[in-house]
Amino acid sequence: MAKGQSLQDPFLNALRRERIPVSIYLVNGIKLQGQIESFDQFVILLKNTVSQMVYKHAISTVVPARAVNHHQHAPGAAGEEQGEAEA
């Protein structure tokens, strides 16, 4: 499970840290907008006029309002992931 979150956590953390507005699309088609206040393994707290707890299993897509640099890996980590993908 840690392998699956090696991309998700840095991405969500960059959105939270830089306070980038996001659109979150749910699996039922509803669009939520706001800023990511916090997140854990199961939920995202989305803040707009109120804070909403959104369960990750209900999320289809997270769309940032602008480009985000989320590659905060240790040196060599990206190369290791590419090597595994090619094998």
From Swiss-Prot:
Gene Ontology cellular component list: cytosol
Coiled-coil intervals: none
Annotated GO MF terms: RNA binding
Keywords: RNA-binding, Stress response
Gene3D superfamilies per record: 2.30.30.100
Domain named Sm: residues: 9-68
GO biological process entries: regulation of DNA-templated transcription; regulation of RNA stability; regulation of translation, ncRNA-mediated
Pfam families, per database record: Hfq
InterPro entries, A to Z: Hfq, LSM_dom_sf, Sm
Stated role: RNA chaperone that binds small regulatory RNA (sRNAs) and mRNAs to facilitate mRNA translational regulation in response to envelope stress, environmental stress and changes in metabolite concentrations. Also binds with high specificity to tRNAs.
Family membership noted in the UniProt record: Belongs to the Hfq family.
HAMAP family: Hfq
Binding partners and assembly: Homohexamer.
Protein name in the entry: RNA-binding protein Hfq
Organism encoding this protein: Aeromonas hydrophila subsp. hydrophila (strain ATCC 7966 / DSM 30187 / BCRC 13018 / CCUG 14551 / JCM 1027 / KCTC 2358 / NCIMB 9240 / NCTC 8049)
